Amino acid sequence: MVISVDLLINAIVAGLLLGGFYAAVTAGVSISFGMLDIVNIAHPAFIILGSYIAYIVNISFGIDPIIVSVVALPAFYALGALVYQVYYLSFEKRGQESLRGLAFFFGLLFITEVSLILVFGVDYRYVEAAYIGPSIHLGLIDMPLRMLVPCLVALAMFGLLELFVTRTFLGRAIMAVSQDQLALQLMAADPIKIKRIAFGISIATASIAGALLIIIQPVEPSVGREYIGRVFAICVLGGLGSMPGTLIAALILGVVESLTSTFYGPSWAPAVSFGFLLLTLAFRPAGLLGR
Amino acid sequence: MNGLKFSAIAIGVGLVVMAFAAWLGLDYFYFAGYTILQYIVLATAWNILGGYCGYVNFGSAAFFAMGAYSSVALHKFDGEIDTWFPDNIAPLLHAIFPLPIPILILFGGIVSGIAGLGMGYLTLRLRGSFFAIATLALAVVLQTLVVNWDFVGGSRGAYIIRPETIVIAGFEINYIIYLFVLMLILAVIALTTARAIERSQLGFGFATIRDDELAAEASGVPTLRLKLIATTLSGAFMGMAGAPFPYYIGYLQPASAFSLDYAVNSIAMPMIGGTTSWIGPLVGSVLLGSLQQIATVTISSAVNLLIVGILLVTFVIIAPNGLVGLTQEHWRKRRRP
């Protein structure tokens, strides 16, 4: 097979753009799973919820989906805090988080997804915005704005999160809770409160990620399932809880997936992320930048 | 009550169910009953690994689908005999093929059992939630392979025409009744196996893994061997449940065979019934299975998944030990007022 250079370059660029978006999708799980050790497999469902909220407001009032998602942040934060409170009281407190906690989130995934199906049906929905459609041409490279804008927003969000986690007091407290909960307690801080805040933030990222998702592709309720694997693959590959690692892993996965769908056909793309995940879990569970 | 007595009683119950079905004389009963029995097998299989050993398997659908697709592959193989083999071998193969469904069930069990063994080796490095995520990954990788495997229909799916009737020992039996009986037998075998495990040394070994794997290993429990037994058995039963499925449904496509519905059901049913004994998955799957059949007929099939989700979440929060746990607690309270 002759690989044409511009096809290759475009596939890599598209992969990097996609990877930036994947970073936004994974940011939440990186916090909840990576730092708090909460296996929130329902995270993609919350992302789809974000997509639908962006969709409704966009269709009814014509407001830009990204603005909608930023406005919706507090609501998602509150939802996350609530979910954590239920999770804490029912599982963490009783020390049953492993088996039943997993089942809890699995159930939550289905409830969210099926509720969306019951309300909106299984039709694909999409949003309208000025930047969906046109693209920028730089020599050989084609960059659709539909991909570029989500990627930039994702990177901005990711950067802010990284700054928050490493520079602010609260962010450092979240890092501390992920390292040693008991020590934090000895410093007279309430680990439960900090975890609640952190989980709230992790769900809040789903609002933005959801809006970006529906800009990139039409969405129907079960699309989220495809992201379960991607999100955990990136999170594990990046080294749990390491934000820079997550970003690198997201970009790698984006590029590999893009190359796979360009050269082997899109039907093989889902196997890439899960294959990655299986290989990482089997050979280097600590991830790229893991401790 | 020993194993023999138990299986005798289980077969007795099965016969009563059969008699009831014959008395109703409704074909629909067999269709609905088949689904419920299939869930009994799936839930029991899941519980062997999930309930007894404490390893959560999100990939039930993959094992189920592997069983189903092994049947499809054998069915397709039957159709290709004349083109693939020379004239002197073909008649010989035609005498064997098409294989009867019990053989297909066995075959599906072997295929999924081998996959289960492979999954068992994953437990060497992966514990807890990592294992659960890896099983989910396994399911998607397998689904992608099947989608890209044209021989079994790829993403277009495969049709299998179900015969109207089958002749066994001179009697002409409606095919759906035949499938129903096979699944009934399979359910009895699965339950008997689960119960036997529970009361054997194997079951105690499993329980030590569930409670504290490190301590178990330190005390000389051969944890790896036990885990491999559990994953293989669990996978094999799921495959066996899936093998007759193409004949039941008539048209199999990857999205329906690998549907997460099987994964969520095979987790929800034991969780709702109770994971510590064989009764739990049985109670859970009969209750939830019937409820879903009723919801599918009266409301819609989307609602029945919602019901499963809500019940699952409610039960893990309120009744961590399921219905069986609730009744046990109730009896304990009555005994000591």
What are these regions (language model features)?
Chain A
Residues 6-10, 53, 57-60, 214, ...:
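Interhelical loop and adjacent transmembrane-helix boundary motif
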Residues 2-14, 165, 169, 198-235, ...:
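Inter-helical junctions in multi-pass inner-membrane proteins, predominant
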Residues 7-60, 88-96, 100, 239-243:
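Single transmembrane alpha-helix segments in multi-pass membrane proteins
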Residues 18, 142-219, 243-249:
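Helix-loop-helix "hairpin" substructures at the membrane interface of multi-pass membrane proteins
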Residues 119, 179-186, 190-193, 264-291:
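Cytosolic-side transmembrane-helix boundaries in multi-pass membrane proteins
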Residues 62-108, 115, 248-253, 284-285:
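Alpha-helical transmembrane segments within multi-pass membrane transporters and channels
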Residues 90-91, 97-167, 193-197, 259, ...:
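Transmembrane helix-bundle core of multi-pass membrane transporters
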Residues 24-28, 45-49, 207-208, 221-240, ...:
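Hydrophobic alpha-helical segments embedded in the membrane of multi-pass proteins
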